[in-house]
Regions:
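Mixed-charge (Asp/Glu-Lys/Arg
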Residues: 1-196
């Protein structure tokens, strides 16, 4: 399949076949699969790094439409690089997880800022993705943010979660309610083979 060269477009093209053909096995060539490759992408193009990092958790970049648009925006993001949306109660109203991506040095003040942004934007949770290892004070700051109590799943989720790129490459996932509606789902393929 020939696809666009942005990591935002690659992410969408990667999700769709997995949804349509859950048993199919395929490989995406050209996106980072190691920390070294991720560091190089961050040096080459910070925005592409952000979009790629967001794709690791299936978050929609800020500025991309909820209908699955491939267009993200560059520029002032008010402390938010991406969004995950989920539905976890009978109102069917989407709730938000705000995502911030950092490729440089990180500190506890960035976690405090994310906590403030989550409150200001009336989101339910926040995720901080970092290329560098988080500091002890960062982890402590995230822990003091408390929990989001999901009415539909009757359980608590950490309100602020920190992930390294290494953890995400190893398969670690955001601990959030299962009703993820960030991107429009592709229909599963029916029948024995592809149709035209």
């Amino acid at each position: 399949i020939g696809i666009d060269v942005t990591h935002l477009a690659i992410a969408l093209q990667k999700y769709r076949p997995k949804e349509m053909f859950p048993d199919a096995d395929f490989v995406v060539i050209g996106e980072p699969t190691t920390i070294g490759a991720a560091q190089q992408l961050a040096l080459d193009d910070r925005h592409q790094f952000e979009w790629w990092a967001l794709s690791l958790i299936k978050a929609r970049p800020v500025g991309a439409q909820s209908t699955g648009s491939k267009k993200g925006k560059k520029g002032a993001d008010q402390g938010v690089d991406g969004v995950l949306t989920f539905i976890d109660d009978a109102t069917n109203k989407p709730k938000r997880v705000l995502v911030q991506v950092k490729s440089g040095k990180v500190s506890s003040s960035q976690i405090r800022d994310l906590v403030g942004t989550v409150k200001r934007e009336k989101a339910q949770m926040g995720v901080f993705i970092t290329l560098e290892e988080p500091t002890g004070p960062m982890l402590k700051e995230a822990a003091t943010a408390g929990f989001y109590e999901s009415p539909g799943f009757n359980r608590a989720y950490p309100a602020i979660q920190i992930f390294t790129i290494k953890q995400l490459l190893e398969g670690k996932a955001v601990d959030m309610p299962a009703g993820n509606v960030t991107f429009k789902q592709a229909e599963k393929a029916k029948g024995d083979g592809p149709e035209q």
